[in-house]
Amino acid sequence: MITRKHIIKEIHLTTIMMICMRQLRMEELFTRHSMFSSIFNYSKTLDGLFSIHSP
């Protein structure tokens, strides 16, 4: 028999899971974005170096 308390507990756990997943997804997006921007900055720096050395 499923009690009211049990249902509330389930909903609470589901909510916590959703929040955790959303947090993880946001962090993943953020790390991917920062990785991309650092690679972009690195390539820009390389371009700068090459343009200095090329006649």
Swiss-Prot record:
Highest taxon of source: Viruses
Record-given protein name: Uncharacterized protein U4
Organism listed in the record: Tibrogargan virus (strain CS132) (TIBV)
Gene giving rise to this polypeptide: U4
